[in-house]
């Protein structure tokens, strides 16, 4: 599996290197050519099905296998619901539901939810990249039973205020069509899964920050010497490197 992970990581790296840049992050629109090209390449390469069972058309990899891919995506600052789709398809796969060939986003923060026939209503909070996905996967509790529900996007979207580049939305939904709804298996801890994925993303971002610091200090000169030659700068870089290493331990 290690060789397979290395190959997949190389494919992912090439796609992100080719398509993700500062222009994409600044002017990200669902109908833009740059976004559609990136999305098509990711979907067609089936990178979003890495955690899907083989009998459902996926690669059958484990969560541990995709850690380098989650880190790589964060290092590029990939501004799309790429990892969210991987996790959503994993949850669908665990419920023996075929994965989606489109971007999906997800949340487990819900309020005032109601289900009537095949429709769902409620307030769904802190949904990443909802502007770039047409479907939402939620973990929620209805009548003392936890469910995983996939439904089509609709209703009122409200962009949250945050200091990060990742756009998150609150959704006020009324009678949206349910695509799939299954009882959540007890062995699946969605909250813990999302927290761990976020931690891995944070570590990947910190690695990129460290790399940028080293590159900057190696190129910028003061008093005829690069900053990396100064003892104080070296000490600071070492401290940052230790913090990054500790975070990834």
Region locations from a protein language model:
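N-terminal glycine-rich flavin-associated loop
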Residues: 78-95
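Structural signal for hydrophobic packing residues in well-ordered secondary-structure cores
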Residues: 16-23, 73-77, 95-96, 210, ...
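Glycine-rich cofactor-pocket loops
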Residues: 3, 23-34, 186-194, 211-242
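Solvent-exposed alpha-helix faces
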Residues: 10-13, 211, 242-245
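Amphipathic, small/basic residue-rich leader segments at the start of a protein or domain
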Residues: 1-82, 203
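FAD-binding core of flavoproteins
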Residues: 90-207, 211
């Amino acid at each position: 599996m290690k060789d397979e992970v290395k190959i997949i990581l190389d494919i992912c790296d090439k796609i992100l290197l080719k398509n993700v840049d500062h222009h994409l992050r600044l002017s990200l629109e669902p109908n833009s050519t740059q976004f559609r090209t990136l999305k098509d390449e990711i979907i067609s390469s089936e990178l979003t099905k890495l955690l899907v069972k083989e009998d459902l058309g996926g690669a059958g990899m484990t969560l541990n296998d995709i850690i380098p891919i989650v880190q790589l995506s964060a290092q590029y600052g990939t501004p799309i619901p790429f990892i969210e789709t991987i996790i959503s398809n994993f949850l669908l796969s665990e419920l023996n539901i075929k994965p989606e060939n489109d971007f999906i986003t997800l949340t487990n923060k819900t309020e005032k939810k109601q289900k009537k026939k095949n429709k769902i209503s409620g307030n769904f909070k802190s949904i990443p990249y909802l502007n770039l996905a047409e479907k939402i996967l939620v973990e929620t509790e209805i009548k003392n039973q936890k469910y995983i529900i996939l439904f089509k996007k609709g209703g009122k979207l409200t962009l949250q205020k945050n200091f990060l580049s990742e756009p998150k939305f609150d959704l006020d939904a009324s009678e949206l069509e349910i695509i799939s709804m299954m009882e959540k298996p007890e062995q699946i801890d969605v909250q813990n899964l999302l927290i761990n994925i976020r931690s891995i993303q944070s570590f990947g971002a910190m690695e990129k920050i460290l790399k940028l610091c080293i590159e900057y200090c190696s190129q910028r000169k003061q008093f005829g010497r690069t900053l990396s030659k100064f003892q104080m700068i070296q000490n600071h870089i070492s401290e940052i490197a230790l913090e990054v290493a500790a975070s990834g331990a």
